[in-house]
Amino acid sequence: MKIKLKKYHFLILFLIFLLNSCNINENNINQAFENEEPQTILANIPPDDPDGKYLYNPELTLNWYGYDKDGFIKGFKYRWCTLNSDNDTLWNDWSFIQSIDSDGNKIYDSNMKTFVFESPNERNFHIFEIAAIDDKGKADSSPAKLRFWTKKGPEAETELISSPSNETIVTESTNEFWKGLVFIFKDKNSKYAFKINNNQWSDYIYNDTIILTGKHFPSSGNYTIYFKSRNKYYMEDKSPLEFNVKIIKPLRTKELLLIDMTSDGIGLPGNPTDKETDNFYEMLLKDNNINFDIWDVNNEGFFPDRLKISGYKIIFIYSDHNFNTLENKFLYDDIQKLNEFLFTCGNIIISCKSINNLFYNNEQAYSFFYEIFQIEKNFNSIEILRDNQLKKINGYPTLEIEQNKIPFEWFGGLQNTQTYNPRAFNKSIYFLDSGNKINTTISLLNTKVYKAVLSTLPLYYFKYDEVKQLMKILFDNLK
């Protein structure tokens, strides 16, 4: 028994001796596996210059290098500060540069970058710091530092390359059609601010585009919008750009404006006088209990202005002659007026003998009706109406040619009927003999913003009672 105890004592003493001889403890274990900090070195061009012996351009390219004894460099973080006029320094937030991508591949040019340092004064002092980050995420706790001075940057200049009309209809917010008053500036690297009349300047926006809506303007009237820029050198434009604009906020208090764009005819079949068409549409509106005002483009000498049309919920344009005189065509600004009216939630009806007659050139017509009425650009197809009734979809009254206005036997039918092919949300209501309705003559467009009715076979030529029923349905839809 004593022999066995001696053996155990010997074994215990041997283990104690072995542990002491290895000298292993917890601190040594932690030290053996501790991650060492990476090191960062900045290139000596430009040299560290706290005293301002040299003045550099505000745009500088800096180079650096990082190494890690027990791993590899995953990236860098950098920041800098500029001494402002109050002798105070404000450090930028840290920014990061990756040296290794997600697949473990080295990213080239991660050891250099061109910076633009704010330099609004004749002499500007900066401190730049950069720290390497290793594969374990540990950063150099003593970042490499560079102190240097820059000279004043070039002056800022505010220049617009795109702006809205000097008179425009606005709404409180944008929609899928109306994008607001869009101002686009030339220099994409500058920041921009604005103010309206004598109000406060906005904060600088780091974008080459400023968009304003009706929320920026308390009421209709004339405004001056000022724009200024701050370029990448932190130079601020001392001569802000001025933009004068007449803002119209639509009231829509009136129901309908009837716009006569019919050139005067001689009263023969297919050649109505202006008075004949005027009487037809005025009676049509009165019998449907629609309150309306009249604007005769030929008598007035011009299309109604934005202020006039913005007071109405619906514009009804008719041009029922085979041709149009120059006075009864849309000028470019008239097209813009109609765009703004519709895109700010107005509704429109157009009845015409030919879409093209309303415009000075076909390209204007194609673009307007393709974008606004959502019809294909092949609306130049000319058909002959061989039946005295139009084909139609269910729910709409029959439309039959009025023989007193244009005898159906005249030239074997109603010639030169312009048809078109609706697209998107444009619903074909009346059409000629085609089963798939590609030769539409009357359609209704329903968007989330506005509604539009187009007829390329003048409503004037159809029997009055039938047109009256149709207009009641359309007016109920447009309200």
Predicted regions: what they are:
Residues 270-366:
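Helical hinge/lid and interdomain linker segments adjacent to catalytic or ligand-binding clefts
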